[in-house]
Design a protein with these regions (language model features):
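Conserved helicase NTPase motor core
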Residues: 7-10, 15-16, 21-25, 33-35, ...
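Walker A (P-loop) phosphate-binding loop of P-loop NTPases
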Residues: 29
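A conserved segment at the C-terminal end of the G1
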Residues: 37-41
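Conserved NTP-handling cores and scaffolds of large molecular machines
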Residues: 44-47, 73, 77-81, 109, ...
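ATP-hydrolysis module of ASCE/P-loop NTPase motor domains
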Residues: 53, 94-101, 119-191, 303, ...
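Conserved P-loop NTPase-based nucleic-acid remodeling module centered on helicase motor cores
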Residues: 53-159, 213-217, 445-449
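Conserved ATP-driven helicase/translocase motor core recognized via long
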Residues: 55, 174-362
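Core structural elements
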Residues: 100-111, 162-188, 341-347, 362-375
Length: 453
């Protein structure tokens, strides 16, 4: 049982810290679930300010995890009651534990909608559609949409389909629409996000282009590839040193490794391009009669080096061959296609939402967005919590989020809208290395952004 555990000083601090929001990075096997359970128990058993368990919101990302957490908490409370049978507060917690808000984010959103459907004029008889039903509905909506577009035959649509759906097969275009739709609905305001996609391709200068989100992402990914390649060189150099007598190889590899590492440290695209294009590869050293190293070992090292060389040359040709003018031209050409894709995706989003509402269906993404509409209002100054959110804020003394690395931007806004700002009460725990919900567009970088503050 958690009460019998010996806590480390760090775990004890996590369990006991109060009156502030807290983000805990906990690796697998570090006992984070036990720590979370103990924090819950200490909150409800606090001698100075005991909290009823139904005033805590504990959110995790799987039904199994929520069930396990509930069982652990109930067992821990039962043990405290056994030790203190006359404690009326503990006996009350034992009763309340059956109604404790230990839940998945989807279940919490569902409860918000069941209680406040009238706030967004939602039919209370809605039901959650199954995956097969949704796929059929998506296919019907897309088929009708594309049929209308073909009939209207606008120039932008025809050019888009010629590029991405040659012949009579629309499948690639359909998949692009669905993929972009998936990214859009993983954001709090999907239509705003789609509009921003178009704006991202309107740069008139390299300075502006380098600030676009897609360009920043690409630059970071290229830097990562270069860093990994530099690390490969370090391994090659280590092999040379272990073998001995390979100073000529080591000299060539060290020179190349330094150039690649220098390139990986560039912070902007134009610096990255300049440094990558300055990388020069040396010739293979000839083995002298006096050299004692193994030919097999030398071949293994040089084969690895050739792979790294191909990687760098491929990056140079694919990403760094164009000057500023050509890059801006390509961006504008891509922007034309992106604009059409966004238009089609936006049309699909509206039609698909209307089709679901007509059938009184919601999917899991709808649960989150509809709950968000109940809890947060978009204003010219940004998102503003609603009166309903204020009620939840008063209801919950603390909001505990397990597996925080699996949150996306919609879930983040939902939970922050019901958290307190005057008395911060968010407790978040997770491990960015264990993000398992990328397929649902979880954003583990949310964890890193908070962790680095």
């Amino acid at each position: 049982m958690a009460d019998n555990m010996t806590w480390t000083s760090e775990q004890k601090q996590v369990i006991d810290l109060r009156d502030r929001s807290l983000l805990v990075s906990a690796a697998a096997g570090s006992g984070k679930t036990a720590v979370l359970v103990q924090r819950i128990i200490e909150r409800i058993c606090d001698e100075s300010h005991p909290v009823d368990i139904d005033r805590l919101l504990v959110v995790t990302f799987t039904n199994a995890a929520a069930g396990e957490m509930r069982e652990r908490v109930q067992a821990a409370i039962a043990k405290r009651v056994e030790e203190n049978p006359d404690n009326t507060h503990l006996r009350r917690q034992e009763v309340l534990a059956g109604h404790a808000h230990i839940t998945t984010i989807d279940s919490f959103c569902l409860s918000v909608l069941r209680e406040h459907f009238q706030e967004i004029e939602l039919d209370p008889g809605f039901r959650i559609a199954d995956e097969g039903e949704l796929k059929l509905l998506q296919a019907d909506v897309l088929e009708a949409l594309l049929e209308e577009e073909y009939e209207q035959a606008s120039e932008s649509f025809i050019h888009f389909m010629e590029a991405y759906a040659p012949g009579k097969d629309d499948e690639r275009a359909v998949q692009l629409i669905l993929q972009l739709y998936g990214f859009a609905v993983a954001n709090p305001r999907p239509e705003d996000w789609l509009n921003h996609c178009i704006e991202s391709y309107g740069a008139e200068s390299m300075e502006t282009l380098e600030k676009q989100p897609w360009m920043c992402t690409m630059t970071e990914q290229l830097r990562t590839i270069l860093s990994e390649t530099a690390a490969l060189y370090k391994r090659m150099i280590a092999v040379c040193r272990d073998e001995g007598g390979m100073e000529s190889y080591e000299s060539v590899l060290l020179s190349e490794q330094q150039m690649i590492e220098y390139a990986s440290e560039a912070s902007k695209y134009d610096e990255l391009r300049e440094r990558v294009n300055l990388i020069r590869f040396g010739s293979k050293p000839r083995k002298k009669k006096t050299d004692s190293f193994s030919e097999d070992k030398a071949k293994r090292v040089w084969d690895m080096r050739e792979q790294a060389k191909k990687q760098i040359k491929s990056l140079s040709e694919d990403y760094f061959a164009d000057d500023d003018e050509r890059l801006l031209q390509k961006q504008h050409l891509a922007g034309v296609q992106v604009k059409e894709l966004v238009r089609l995706t936006h049309a699909f989003l509206l039609r698909y939402s209307a089709a679901k509402r007509k059938k009184n269906l919601v999917d899991f993404g709808d649960l989150e967005h509809l709950a968000l509409n109940v809890l947060s209002e978009k204003t010219p100054d940004g998102e503003k919590p609603t009166l309903v959110a204020a009620q939840y804020r008063e209801s919950f003394e603390e909001i505990m989020i397990d597996e925080y690395q699996d949150s996306n931007y919609v879930q983040e806004l939902i939970l922050t809208s019901i958290s307190r700002t005057d008395q911060p009460n968010l407790f978040m725990v997770g491990d960015v290395k264990q993000s398992i919900y990328r397929f649902r567009l979880a954003r583990p970088e949310l964890f890193m952004e908070k962790y680095e503050i």
